[in-house]
Amino acid sequence: MSKRIGISGARSPWWWIPTVYFAEGIPYFVVNSISVTMFTKMGVPNGEMALFTSLLYLPWTLKPLWSPLVDIFKSKKWWIVTMQALMTAAFILLVFSIPHPSPEMIASGRTPSGLFTFTLVLFILTAFASATHDIAADGFYMVVLDPGQQSFFVGIRSTFYRLSSIFGQGVLVVIAGLIESHTGNIPLAWTLTMAVTAVIFALITLYDMFLLPRHKADVAVKSSGRSSAGEFARAFVTFFRKPGILAALAFMLMYRLPEALLLKMVNPFLLSSAEQGGLGLSTATVGLVYGTIGVTALTVGGIIGGMAASRWGLKKSLWPMAAFLALPCAAYVYMSMSMTHNILVISILIAIEQFGYGFGFTAYMLYMMYFSEGEYKTSHYAICTAFMALSMMIPGAFAGYLQEMTGYVNFFWIVMVCCIATAGVTCLLKVDPEYGKVVKK
């Protein structure tokens, strides 16, 4: 698999897959996870925080609409490097855009979201660039590598994406927490954390600019606008004419409802004071417990879920995975009622919940692949991922207001009731019993 390294020749994928997929994850987690923690620590009310940060999912929902442009204009390498440069610029501007509300305003929990207007604009810009980078990176992966290399490196790319998750949700949050504990200045902590992010991302961008290989197959696709538009429209029409489309849409939109509500309120719950109904953990502790231990458990759950599905197939795995995804949400009911401050107990409960989520999410991913089978497999899978993003965006947008109206205990009980939706849509599915099983030769 080793190949000669040259300026215009093929390079070993080991030179670029780690950085490209690490860079794919960082902006996603900064936009969708760090933003939640930062706004919470800055005293933005949960309702406004959850609404605005959920809307940041929009580019990942809409990306199938402009994905053909990445094929038609310029090479995939050009798109990857350009989007990385754009995101580097956005991270640098974020360093200077973060407002500095007074400690009294932060403590009140009523910091106006209007203070963060420019910050949100930069997050939106980063989100669109990140979604476009996803399209280009996956396209580059498929164009440059042969099928054997694609199979070999699929685990490598997933590993570095998960490492970026630990870095984004764990390491960066711990850095912010340590700076906060040493200086007592929350805005300064997040400003310096964004500076660290900008420097690291700039280095990755420079590396990929020079080390990402040029490849003869990585060229703009030449096709007439009319034929491209026709194929694009045909892909959408055939998707919505698939047998079982209503059950599939219900599943894609409702299967993750408990997790979609829960996700936006986990960090606020862990960070909020006891008077506000939270556990009052420090920022650094949340970065360690949720961003590192939790993400590791999530990854292990996904790996074991893949092994289980390959042995039993999707049909037999579906109900156990649905149960694993939904029922561990009870961990937050327990924590909110007991108000435990035992870090070991909190870590174990979060690890169980995240393991269940990783295990249960496997069924969701496999079903999207199953439903996408056919002539327009790639386009149909992209549409499925858009519905996946929508399934997280809409419930998340209202989660904060729901929590403010009900309090954390009642909110987590509502999340448990929503597990009925997960079970209900799972009942609707009809799946080939052999799909997902590894064929023994």
Regions of interest found by a model, annotated:
Residues 315-364:
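C-terminal transmembrane helical hairpin of 12-TM major facilitator-type secondary transporters
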Residues 1-10, 44, 98, 104-120, ...:
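Intracellular loop-helix junctions on the cytosolic face of multi-pass helical membrane proteins
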